[in-house]
Structure formats: C-alpha cells, structure tokens
Amino acid sequence: MKNIGVRYGLLGGAAVIFYFLLLYMVRKDLFLSPWLQWASLLIYLGCMYRATKEDGVLHGYQRDFRMMVRAPFVVFLLINIAYWLFYYALHLTDPELLRMETALDLTFKKQQLTAGLGDPQEANQLREQILALEKQAIQPLVQPLGPILFRLAIGSIGGFLLAAGVTALVRSGVAEENR
C-alpha cells in the first residue's frame, strides 16, 4: 500500500481491535478497565511513530511540519475510527456491557458525592446525574450513536496533539543524529 498513514492506520486498527477483543473474551470487566483502555494508546503511538519515521525517510525530514504531521494524524484517525466502530458494535451485540458501564459510572458518582464536593451546586448536579443513571439502569439499555461520534470527534483533537508530539520527537531525534 502506497499511503504510509493508511497502511499503519489499518494495521493499528486491527491491532487495537484484537487487543480489546482479547480483553473482552478474557473478562468483560477488563474491557471496561480505564487503565487497560489507556494502555491501548501504546499501539496508537507505536504505529504513529513508525509511520512518521517511514514517511520521513521517503519524503525527507526537513519538510514543513504541517506536511510531516499528516501521516501520524491519519494513523491516529484510522485507528480511532476502528476502535469506536468496534466499541459500538460490541455494545450493540452485548447490552450487558452498557449495564456494567452504567453501574461503574453510578458507583463512581456516588463515591464522589460521599467524599464531598464542597460546592452545593455541584453536589445537586451530581445528585441529578445519579438519579438519571438509576432510572437508566432500570430500563433496557441501548448504546446511542451520538455519544460515540462525540467521543470520536473530541479524541481527534487529542490525536492531533499526539501526532504533533510524535512528529516533533522524530524530527528532534533526526536532528540529533545529524549533529
């Protein structure tokens, strides 16, 4: 495949899906673990780094920064799209995941309220959120697409920052090697 960003994006997307499928098959609660969710960024970063290095070798490292950041950003976007599509599909096929997430969110919010927030207005908002979650837990749950698309869009901002960081890291490493 000629496009480096697309190649590493698809490869990384497959790796992330495999990683989360493995977690899901071992134990569902592992799939929902925030630490293991964040650990998947290592796959993102590895693919972004390889794409940036390969793109730099092919097109040169002295190009405009905006041109260099494209490959790792495309990698991030494709991996992230693959992840969120997998996440959405898995939640549609296994509604128990959404119940588990709701229970975790409810527990977290109750712990926050018990610990005390200090601000009465924030405490009232948290109580309202807890009531909404308790009502939601009673009804049959279906994963809506809207929040998934919102998370995908917000994640793209962070993805661009990661791509810029990887690009800067690769460029500075190349500059050090040339000295």
Question: Which residues does each PLM region occupy?
Answer:
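C-terminal halves and exits of single transmembrane alpha-helices
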Residues: 74-97
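Amphipathic, cytosolic membrane-interfacial segments at TM-TM junctions
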Residues: 56-69
